[in-house]
Structure formats: structure tokens, C-alpha cells
Amino acid sequence: MTQTSPQGEGRGPHEQGREILEGVRVGIAHHLGWAVAVTASAGHEVVDRRRIELIEPGMPAAPIEHDAKPLDDAAAARLVAEVRASALRATSASLDQLAASLPGPIVSMSLRAWPLDFPDDIAVQRRPPYESRADSVMYCQVLSDCAYERGWQVHLYGAKDVEAQAAGILGERAGDVLGRPRATLGPPWTKDHRISLAATIVAS
């Protein structure tokens, strides 16, 4: 996935510039070790889309669900701590690179919602019903921590309904705003991209 040029058809340069000066919003659709990031202006124009790395090369992307299975709880906890530290370094670097390349300051980041009372104890995380979600939650927490460290607001969204929520906010503009990027920017424009853009709209 590559970053894109601003999507500004139908808007004057002064209006686009004013919207960008107001700040841009980032929507994230994360996976294990990487994420799709879509950045939009206050007027919901896509100014950047890219894949970002959330973990360093060579580190296990899903320690709880896979790599820690043969380990005892103490060894599993050490492995998860190493992976989390790697994720923090990689995510910080990815977000700093993103922020440095944008035409305006980032004001918020939108992330998929996760249970805020998710257990911290690794021994508990290794048991059902937590083990299938623990690694994903770790990435959410790392992304959130990185955003707060940079002074960005953090918004949480539900992946199943965020597109409908965005359409409700946009009203008659929904088809144009949500459908235009695929036509004007070309591939890649996947479900992850649509969800990420919708999340920035709901956060605005």
C-alpha cells in the first residue's frame, strides 16, 4: 500500500488549505503486526493512505495465540514483554514517519474498540475466552499509548457499524465522500481503507 496525493476535486485551494490547517485525523484498521492508516482532512478528503508496521522484523506478531503456547507462564510473560517493547518502538517510528509527511498536524487517531477491562495478567490472557484476542488488544493499547504520548485524541469505533455511522453524519454527501476515493485514488482501496476513512468522519 502506498501513500497518496491529496484528494481535492471540487474544492478550492484556499478551502483545502484551511481544512488541513485545522488538523487531520487518522483512522487505523490494524492487524497482527501491521495496519492500514488513512488520513483525512476536516472536510473528509483523503490526504494519505499507507501500510504501517507495528512490530520490528523478526519478532513474533502473535505471541499469546501462537509463540507462547509451549512456554510456562513466566516465560510467556517475558516473551510478551519483549514483543510489546518491540511493538512500541516500531509503532512509534511508523507514526512519527506518518506525522512528518502530512500537510497538517494530527489531531486524532481512531482505533477499533477493545474491552477496556481486558485482563493484564498474561496467565489469564492465555486462557479462553481471552487468548484469541490478546494479541490484537496489545496492538490497540500500544497504538493508543503512542497517540496519547503525541497529544492526539483517541477515538474508538466498532468495525461493523462505523461505515453506517459515517453515512448518517454525511447525509446526502455520503455517496460522494465515501465512494470517491476508490474512483479517484485507485487501488489499493479495500474494506480496511473504507473503515479507516469512516472512522475519521465519526471522530470529527
Where are the predicted features?
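Phosphate- and other anionic-substrate recognition elements at nucleic-acid/protein interfaces
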Residues: 1-4, 17-204
